[in-house]
Curated annotation (Swiss-Prot):
Name of the molecule in the record: DegV domain-containing protein YqaC
PANTHER family per record: DEGV DOMAIN-CONTAINING PROTEIN DR_1986-RELATED, FATTY ACID-BINDING PROTEIN TM_1468
Keyword Disulfide bond: no
Domain annotation DegV: ranges: 3-279
Gene3D superfamilies: 3.30.1180.10, 3.40.50.10170
Function of the molecule: May bind long-chain fatty acids, such as palmitate, and may play a role in lipid transport or fatty acid metabolism.
Listed SUPFAM superfamilies: DAK1/DegV-like
InterPro entries reported in the protein's UniProt record: DegV (IPR003797), DegV_C (IPR043168), DegV_domain_contain (IPR050270)
């Protein structure tokens, strides 16, 4: 088996995997104030600076289907026998529906695009797991089974500080954002079972929201040693450190602080903090 793994630039994974020859990343076009940016050439912090200074709402669009089609044809010519594509959830992006037909277009390759239901670091962690298993010589069917097990065990909760970013992204009405701000509501967001970002609970004050997120962490990960924990933020270092310290104090032994990439940060806004848990590799 010769396996290629394809993902998109919403996935965040460890630096070492960027050198893997069988990993391919599709760019999600993104722009601020009419200027397009290459996500492979801009750091998270540089993007946050652009967000803070932007006159208009940053805009994202789908990866190009033609680009994926060309890549798949090249992979077939290179002798790849299997392709696994792990992309933004269908509930977030129409890309998944647009590329679904490509799974049956290649006679010499088995092409599979399973639903992921999550993004950011948890999606990147699934990419890492698949690459590790392929490197170890694990069969394709077993890799798919492990991916599904990890995906179905993923959970993520987010504290959004400024509701106006959600309103700008179309996930909350302007009226609701204004009212929520006046009432000091700091909602807990999550990914639904279909992969849609939705309000899990409406909580007043940051302190209460942070407390609720800690409760949810313990509820979802009853065996701390069985899970990888990502604490993810957009310039919310103090809150991220608080969640990190709490996770360690509760017996989690694989906890990492990371930052949201531009695609997700654009929708959640600055000063957002989250955690994502994934069953370990």
């Amino acid at each position: 088996m010769k396996l290629a793994v394809i993902t998109d630039s919403s996935a965040d994974f460890a630096e070492k995997y960027k050198t893997y020859e069988n990993l391919f990343v599709l760019d999600i076009p993104i722009s601020i104030d009419g200027v397009d940016y290459d996500l492979q050439k801009i750091s998270h912090e540089e993007w946050y600076d652009l967000m803070a200074e932007a006159q208009e709402v940053p805009k994202t669009s789908q990866p190009r289907v033609a680009e994926l089609d060309r890549l798949l044809k090249d992979l077939e010519k290179q002798g790849y026998t299997h392709v696994l594509g792990l992309f933004l959830p269908a509930a977030i992006s129409g890309f998944y529906q647009n590329i679904f037909y490509l799974q049956s277009e290649y006679e010499q390759m088995k092409v599979v695009f399973p639903e992921t239901f999550i993004t950011s670091s948890p999606l990147g962690y699934m990419v890492e797991t698949v690459l590790d298993l392929a490197e170890a010589g694990v069969e394709f069917e077993e890799i798919i089974a492990k991916f599904e097990e990890q995906r179905d065990g993923d959970r993520a909760y987010m504290l959004v500080d400024d509701l106006h970013w959600l309103a700008k992204g179309g996930r909350l009405s302007n009226g609701a954002a204004v009212l929520g701000t006046l009432l000091n509501i700091k909602p807990v967001l999550t990914f639904s079972t279909e992969g849609k970002v939705e309000v899990f609970e409406k909580v007043r004050t940051v302190k209460k929201t942070m407390s609720r997120m800690k409760e949810l962490l313990l509820k979802d990960a009853k065996d701390p040693l069985a899970y990888k924990v990502y604490v993810i933020h957009t310039r919310a270092e103090d809150r991220a450190q608080e969640l990190y310290d709490y996770a360690l104090s509760q017996g989690f032994d694989d906890v990492e602080i990371v930052t949201f990439g531009p695609v997700i940060a654009t929708h959640l806004g600055l000063n957002t903090v989250a955690y994502g848990i994934s069953p370990k590799k």
